[in-house]
């Protein structure tokens, strides 16, 4: 950002644009690569971070556990890693806008991320329970679905947060 800001101050918008584009390309490649690795290697990641979940399939079959936490964790990792990549790109947009002394949109944009998560939780909870604000009415399966809905909402919110900052 300091180099980009200096190019803007020196009234070199073409060079600044090329520099910002190059940085965006690098961030897109790096964040996209990490997101892809997270999706592909979600099972080993969960195995390392939550080894206690490994025997969940057997425990669910035996009736001692209501759902398979390992499978759920793998599914959430596969949604959250791409979301994190989108948030990296959103931070790039924030830096570019700040360099142009545009502060409102970059600092309001994260509210869209939060609003998307909240909206999907309320909407998903209503659809699954039939009553807003009644989490006790949700079964274990419905709570699992609600967690996945929240993850999708977070990913969608990240896209909104990034999208509103684009020129």
Which sequence ranges carry the predicted segments?
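Membrane-embedded alpha-helical bundles of multi-pass transporters/translocases
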Residues: 1-167
